């Protein structure tokens, strides 16, 4: 059985956590909770987490499906270098971002999810994983001369493939092949 790539699970968990934090922050801010400023913090932290987690990392084996529009955010995440590619840093960043949001009921679910994502990132870092961007390779065009094996010898229009078959030895010798045969008994059409 193959080895589990923990970073993929952590990425999905952290992205969902960011969206949950944004939602809880909107509820807390719009509902004018007593500590509504923690709701505003949760919105900002959720947006930061979503921007950081939207680009998927490349898998070590197999292929990775790129998210829609990921290539633009990948460039931004690559700029920060080891701050974003090291999963130890991501684990502690997520854990630190989740603490203030834990003091508000509307954002406590996002906090719990982000703490779980942080622990999964820590597990991924312990297993030696790191974030590498998915870079699209240019598509190779087939060589025009390399795809044609043998050019056709007959000019168009060509007869169908069955009609172009070379006659077999039996047909050359006069032995009837699979064509029409003569019925040895005469058949008459009698209508009664």
Curated annotation (Swiss-Prot):
Extracellular compartment spans = 31-35, 105
Q: Which residues lie within the membrane without crossing it?
A: 70-80
The residue ranges for the Cytoplasmic side of the membrane come to 2-7, 54-69, 81-86, 127-192
Origin, by domain of life? Eukaryota
Alphabetically list the UniProt keywords. Answer: Cell membrane, Electron transport, Heme, Iron, Isopeptide bond, Membrane, Metal-binding, NADP, Oxidoreductase, Phosphoprotein, Transmembrane, Transmembrane helix, Transport, Ubl conjugation
Q: Which residues are modified to Phosphoserine? A: 168
Crosslink site(s) for Glycyl lysine isopeptide (Lys-Gly) (interchain with G-Cter in ubiquitin)? 149
Any one Gene Ontology BP term: inflammatory response
Instruction: Specify whether Transport is a keyword of the entry.
Output: yes
Protein family membership: Belongs to the p22phox family.
What function does this protein fulfil?
Subunit of NADPH oxidase complexes that is required for the NADPH oxidase activity that generates, in various cell types, superoxide from molecular oxygen utilizing NADPH as an electron donor. Subunit of the phagocyte NADPH oxidase complex that mediates the transfer of electrons from cytosolic NADPH to O2 to produce the superoxide anion (O2(-)). In the activated complex, electrons are first transferred from NADPH to flavin adenine dinucleotide (FAD) and subsequently transferred via two heme molecules to molecular oxygen, producing superoxide through an outer-sphere reaction.
Provide the assembly information.
Answer: Component of the phagocyte NADPH oxidase core complex/cytochrome b558 complex, composed of CYBB (heavy chain (beta)) and CYBA (light chain (alpha)). Component of the phagocyte NADPH oxidase complex composed of an obligatory core heterodimer formed by the membrane proteins CYBA and CYBB and the cytosolic regulatory subunits NCF1/p47-phox, NCF2/p67-phox, NCF4/p40-phox and the small GTPase RAC1 or RAC2. Interacts with NCF1 (via SH3 domain). Interacts with SH3PXD2A. Interacts with DUOX1, DUOX2 and TPO. Interacts with NOX4; this interaction mediates superoxide generation.
For this entry, the protein name equals Cytochrome b-245 light chain
